Amino acid sequence: MKIVLASKSPRRRELLSNLGLDFEVIESNVEEFSSEKHPSRYVMDLSFNKAMSVAKKLKEEAIVIGADTIVVIEDKVLGKPKDRDEAFIMLKNLQGRVHTVYTGITIVRTKDFKYVSDFEETKVWIKKLEDEEIFNYIDTGEGYDKAGAYAIQGVGALIVEKIEGDYFNVVGLPISKLFDILKREFDVRLL
């Protein structure tokens, strides 16, 4: 069965490619807005909107995967930084503390529009950093298109002290949860 990733994230593409999956990418282009207040419901709502918008456009039978990731610290949601100053503020706020990364995933089968939404959460501790180190990291440019302004899979690994939970969730797609849902709910076997 055809698999479609409803995401423009290069990290999600890379994660699925690393699994050896044959898939197509179709960006959803939906507005990333949800009235949900709880982080887990918020990311599931956004992932649902992305997956369903792509699923409705498809003519052939497919499994569509949508995802959305946010960073939350003390009930404050951090999205992608708009500029260098906002990236600095985010990283300054995260450093020396723990935050939570939430990723919502939704899988939609176009044949009958059956869908399953779920989420993963991972605790991340960022090291205490000097301002110069924060600016040097920002100047690598890798954090601009990422929630929380850092990439754990890149140079950002240098600023992460530890994590508790799913590493791939922090990258942007909880692979194990995706595998389980595809197998259990849609009889799609990746192994």
From Swiss-Prot:
Residues the record marks as site: Important for substrate specificity: 11, 69, 153
UniProt keyword annotations, A-Z: Cytoplasm, Hydrolase, Nucleotide metabolism
Subcellular location(s) of the protein: Cytoplasm
Chief place where the protein resides: cytoplasm
Catalytic activity: dTTP + H2O = dTMP + diphosphate + H(+); UTP + H2O = UMP + diphosphate + H(+)
PANTHER family, per the entry: BIFUNCTIONAL DTTP/UTP PYROPHOSPHATASE/METHYLTRANSFERASE PROTEIN-RELATED, BIFUNCTIONAL DTTP_UTP PYROPHOSPHATASE_METHYLTRANSFERASE PROTEIN-RELATED
NCBIfam families: maf
Protein name: dTTP/UTP pyrophosphatase
UniProt lineage: Bacteria, Bacillati, Bacillota, Clostridia, Thermoanaerobacterales
